[in-house]
């Protein structure tokens, strides 16, 4: 959506004010047509990083992708469009030149996934809406999230592109239409909740929204210019698990809310959920915790009970093997 000239002037002229501006403001066109929503840690977001299961997920993709095509027409159509574009670019290049050198491990599926996400189609909107809700429970992800393949491929693609990048963190800009975000205030820790498109160019980001405008210092986002349907936008894609600190915000009477974020790190609730479920269907298994590196509640309770029992018995080396969990 193109921003009217007056709105562009507002975006340029609105300065960063100290602290959160709390005031009563008059109803404007933005207030009528935009929705206000909190900017927080997005607890319902599906944030799997696939740590330790990249090879297993890659092996599972053919069957998984086929089943998701059948269940999700928007995804199937978007993928077909992107695949045609990818094959065309591989054969002939594009009006912006040939494909960029790909990092080691980058496959055709990664390129198609990035093209599908950036295409002018309903896919990216439906996908991100589903990502923001799929983490409400493990069962919801397994049984109701029909974008598992796309989520994995985008996550891995960003990891590969980021590792291939010469510089680390970078300043990007993000414009949002239809939502006025409300952070808790300076110092709060937040996540963007889905795969967030931003741009290296301030002006390009302004074209995408007039309700909230972000200035973001990201360390996990990766430039995807060479894999986008619209390379001139200089897009940087930020994964849903990157965490940020709110540096400052402003809420002018008219014009966009402005929010400035600085990268903190990453945080995930889930890890390798599809592979855990797949392995459990084929035989007995222990799932443990979704969060990598943590101990499950059942294991902790078992260890406590065994400790109490063993402490009341004479020392027996054979019993020590029971404490493994």
UniProtKB/Swiss-Prot annotation:
InterPro entries recorded: ADP-ribosyltransferase_ARG, ART
Family per similarity comment: Belongs to the Arg-specific ADP-ribosyltransferase family.
Signal sequence interval, chain numbering: 1-22
Keywords: Disulfide bond, Glycoprotein, Glycosyltransferase, GPI-anchor, Lipoprotein, Membrane, NAD, NADP, Nucleotidyltransferase, Sarcoplasmic reticulum, Signal, Transferase
Glycosylation site positions: 65, 248
Domain spans labelled TR mART core: 73-268
Catalytic activity, EC: 2.4.2.31
Catalytic activity: L-arginyl-[protein] + NAD(+) = N(omega)-(ADP-D-ribosyl)-L-arginyl-[protein] + nicotinamide + H(+)
Gene: Art1
Keyword Disulfide bond: yes
GO molecular function terms listed in the Swiss-Prot or TrEMBL record: NAD+ poly-ADP-ribosyltransferase activity; NAD+-protein-arginine ADP-ribosyltransferase activity; nucleotidyltransferase activity
Active site annotation, chain numbering: 174, 197, 235
Organism: Mus musculus (Mouse)
Compartment annotation: Sarcoplasmic reticulum membrane
GPI-anchor amidated serine-type lipidated residues: 290
Entry protein name: GPI-linked NAD(P)(+)--arginine ADP-ribosyltransferase 1
GO cellular component, one term: cell surface
Function field: Has ADP-ribosyltransferase activity toward GLP1R.
Expression sites by tissue: Abundantly expressed in cardiac and skeletal muscle. Low levels also found in lung.
Pfam families assigned: ART
Main location: membrane
Residue positions assigned to the propeptide: 291-325
